[in-house]
């Protein structure tokens, strides 16, 4: 699963809508901010799975055509993996560019996405890797991975669903393994519009992410909030230092 790089949860209800322009033209053409009341926010969060399946081919084409401005955090994640590591990509979308880059470095990838169309693209592009149609909020495998990432996917979940993901992260990450996810720079919700369809985003406060990581056995390695060098993404990179409960 992917998301429009230009829209972050810093754009909350009550903020004046953007005119759709952006200093990064490849981002601006993907999505424009669009604003709703609280009830619509809840509906928007519940429609994410259907949204990505409906627009899977268009979104995949747009993502592949856009410049990969958020590559540095992915590269940093990769440098922390042991040789031959197995990586779980939650919300993998069509596999380009993130899963394809990780696979090209010689790592084993298990990609999970709720969109059958997106997973079909992954299977065509990288048939030697493992691809699963599932919702990250409920998927379980009984396996632990050396690396787990939820990039441009986690922040499509509502606040409570985001909180519930941390025990899942812990259960999926091997001791000493690395976790990477991105969200927004502050607590909030926003709904953008992709091809005329509402597209929901949410974020908790950075301090709450830090607490959730700590409480679920992770040690924070790095975080960045909206830095241009990281494609203006806000991300958290952490290592599992305590084995999750069996």
What are these regions (language model features)?
Residues 35, 41-82, 187:
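Conserved class I S-adenosyl-L-methionine
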Residues 88-138:
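Class I SAM-dependent methyltransferase SAM/SAH-binding core
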Residues 149-150:
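A conserved beta-strand element that flanks and buttresses the S-adenosyl-L-methionine
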Residues 163-175:
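A short glycine-rich, Lys/Arg-flanked "PGG" loop and its adjoining helix->strand segment in the class I
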Residues 176-183:
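Conserved beta-strand signature within the Rossmann-like core of class I S-adenosyl-L-methionine
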Residues 184-189, 227-228:
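Short "lid" loop at the C-terminus of a central beta-strand within the Rossmann-like core
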Residues 192-208:
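Acceptor-substrate binding/catalytic loop of class I
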Residues 225-246:
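Core SAM-dependent methyltransferase catalytic element
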């Amino acid at each position: 699963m992917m998301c429009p790089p230009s829209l972050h949860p810093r754009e909350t209800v009550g903020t004046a809508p953007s005119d759709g322009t952006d200093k990064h033209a490849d981002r601006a053409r993907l999505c424009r901010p669009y604003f709703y009341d609280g009830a619509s926010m809840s509906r928007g969060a519940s429609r994410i799975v259907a949204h990505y399946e409906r627009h899977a081919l268009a979104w995949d084409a747009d993502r592949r055509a856009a410049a990969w401005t958020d590559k540095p955090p992915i590269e940093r994640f990769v440098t922390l993996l042991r040789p031959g590591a197995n990586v779980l990509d939650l919300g993998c979308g069509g596999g380009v560019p993130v899963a394809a880059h990780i696979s090209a470095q010689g790592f084993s990838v298990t990609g999970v996405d709720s969109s059958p169309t997106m997973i079909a693209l992954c299977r065509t592009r990288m048939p030697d890797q493992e691809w699963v149609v599932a919702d990250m909020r409920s998927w379980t495998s009984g396996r632990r991975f050396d690396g787990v990432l939820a990039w441009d996917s986690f922040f499509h979940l509502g606040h409570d669903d985001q909180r519930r993901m941390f025990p899942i992260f812990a259960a999926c990450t091997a001791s000493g393994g690395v976790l990477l996810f991105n969200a927004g720079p502050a607590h909030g919700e926003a709904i953008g519009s992709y091809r005329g369809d509402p597209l929901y985003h949410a974020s908790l406060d950075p301090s709450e992410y830090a607490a959730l990581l700590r409480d679920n056995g992770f040690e924070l390695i790095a975080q960045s909030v909206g830095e241009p060098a990281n494609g203006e993404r806000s991300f958290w990179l952490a290592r599992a230092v305590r084995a999750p409960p069996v």
